[in-house]
Amino acid sequence: MPYAILVVSALLYGLALNLPVGTMPLALLADGTAAPAVAIAMGSGMFAALFVSLPIGALTDRIGRLPMLRASAGLGILSLLGLGFAHGPVLGGILLGIRSIALVGYMTAEFAYAGEIASKERAVSGVATLGMIGNLTFAIAPAVSVFLWQHGIGREQYAWACGLAICGFALLFALPGKFDERRGRGTRAPILMHPRWYPAVGFALACTLQGGVNGSLAILTFHQRGIVNGAAIFTASAFTSFALRYPAGRLVDRFGPRAVAVPTALLSALGCVFAASAHSLLAVVFAGLLLGTSWAAVVPVALGLLFEHSSSRTRGAAMGAYTLAFSAGAATGATVATLATLAGGGYTIAMTLCAVGPLAVLPYVLRSRRSARVLRGLREVATPS
């Protein structure tokens, strides 16, 4: 029951908070904001997430999952309400940054709490499947927001959506405290980043590079190549990832993250290569299918590596490292896209570089060792009572 409550809360909250992704650029342009200023305002959320991921993870361990969940949900509602009335790139950028901080806090505490609900044998698939809700709301909400905008419903849609977010917020108070964990005062200093989390962070970052490049250049590049609907790469990837996330999580539960990391890295590299050379809609869709299959496993692989070296008392910090990895990967990918374009290689060179990333990090992941604590835990699970 707590897991179902968390899923419904995440669905309602995510649908509301992701509406501005689709129409805030249109709203800012309607205010007369120049295109570069719009890009900076929209990018403020990305950089806010980079700066706060680790501190929020440590704070989650300090105060507990439920307080962080509720505080983040409340902050997100306030930011959404503000976006319904704010005008101009400065105030809009600030509120988008606050929105991003709220989402990072919500997701960090949500995943840490869910990790305690699921059994040890299904911890990875349980948390990874919950992450599908975020992917689903990100796929649906911006498109719905644009549809509403096209039918004359502007910024007021954000204020109306606060109703959904408030419903999600209210559900959080139905979650039992027995799955919460906090360090409290008088304990050791909070952990921001443990060295044994580096393989998980590196792998997630390397596999997320392509997302930053595709978000920056894919549609424009495919349009220049004569492909009518280049956005098909995102559609194919999103639906494939959604369909395969739970099976991928169960594979990690069963065989461990390192065994699944090998085909994941290979599929990511192949997807990048096919996307770089795609000159037809069929090739674009095929590249999206490969990238979506890989992406379905990236999340559970990263979670599995993090769970190996984190306990209940450090799970918040581990999830902070998780959110940092994906935020940094997208930001780095966007930077790679910009540099490749300036160098004249554009999308082809950028995606080729992205293909190298997961393969380069893979040996580091395979060499990483489990902690003695986890090995003992696995032996206990394998020993019949």
Predicted features along the sequence, with ranges:
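Juxtamembrane intracellular "pre-TM" segments in multi-pass secondary transporters
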Residues: 1, 177-203
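Helix-loop boundary and gating motifs at the non-cytosolic
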Residues: 1-46, 199, 203, 208-225
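Symmetry-related core transmembrane helices of the 12-TM Major Facilitator Superfamily/SLC fold
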Residues: 157-173, 351-366
